Amino acid sequence: MAESVTKGFFPSQVVSDNEKISPEYGLKVARAIESEWFKRDSGTNRFYNNQNEFHKLRLYARGEQSIQKYKDELSINGDLSYLNLDWKPVPIIPKFVDIVVNGIAERTFDVKAYSQDPYGTSKRTAYMESILRDIETRELTEFAQSAFGINLQENNPEMLPENSEELDLHMQLNYKQEIEIAEEQAIAIILNGNKFEETRKRLHYDLTTIGIACVKDHFTTSEGIKIEYVDPANIVYSYTESPYFDDIYYVGEVKTIPINELKKQFPNLSEEELSKIAKQPNQKSHMHYRTAASNDTNDKNTIDLLYFNYKTFMNEVYKVKDTSTGGTKVILRDDQFDPPIQEMTGQFEKIERSLEVLYEGVLVLGTDKLLKWEIAKNMMRPKSDHTKVKMNYNIVAPRMYKGKIESLVKRVTGFADMIQLTHLKLQQVMARMVPDGVYLDADGLAEVDLGNGTN
């Protein structure tokens, strides 16, 4: 069955840029996300349901699933007093999860960079042409070298391929431009600095266990490019049917942080505001946003924050004016710049374009306190289309259909339950197969007459 979604009431995107950047607009977006994922008055709570479902699947993957269902199956009117069984789950699923995860991890890769810009392509082409000339004039250059001592070859003769097939291999295996080597080293340093190999293993485990994986990339002035693992149980996103989540317009994650970390991230908060946030009723109860499993690990000195990205568009408007010296002057205007056509004739013209932008926001869950709402300072854009923007969160769920996420562990939980019940039934059968005991009367043996006048 497809996932049911409670639609939130998002503000209109067809408004001015000045209105979009206002805190009031950001609070409307945050409230809509909160309503879509966290409210229970409609009979459903997507965030709570996702956390419970993923928690259950992870317990199955560890062989630590709840045994209450097995006790209910074997008990008679709830009575277990006559059963003497080992209720420990049989670790069937963990073995196959490890096999699948390790098999995926063995598919290693190396980063290879190839320059495709006009300069890099022309440089590669010129290098190939020089080698081809050396191959075609090999006999002539050898004669000139032996007869006149003149080296006419453009490249090292020891590294010269024998034919065009070897030239293709040489270009693939040995030829590297300086910019390509620098790019490969830069990517390797970023991945190693973020311990991406360890993160990749966690992603493989999540894909196998719960069917969805997520990482977040962002830029900080102190640490540069950061790639962080994100628990899929804590993310929120707009409805999508794409397994690569490439058509979502908002995404975010819930983080539980202590008060001191909140002050560190938002130093402009006063002591009075911090105290007010910590004393919010919803923040105290936590029942609106946290599962029963997570309540035990949190205290009243922690705060639930919703970090989110919101994708919308903005209008870039320019006024192009001809100067008295014959030049052209381009002046940036806001999207409300709309002079009459009569004024633009012969004096200036208006140029505009629409492009996607990301807004970043932080909401204290259960309150109307919006800690952050601004245009993202570092936005990723595809090189082929600078009007598009990419989210900071990269999510994938390969077996998703109509919003419903499927995983390997989810498909085998039924078989694991049957194996566990069979294991318990076997224990019952083995207990009934124990033969009847033999009772020996020691006093009776002492009174037996041995026939020699003694007992």
Language model segments and positions:
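Extended, charged amphipathic alpha-helical segments
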Residues: D322-N455
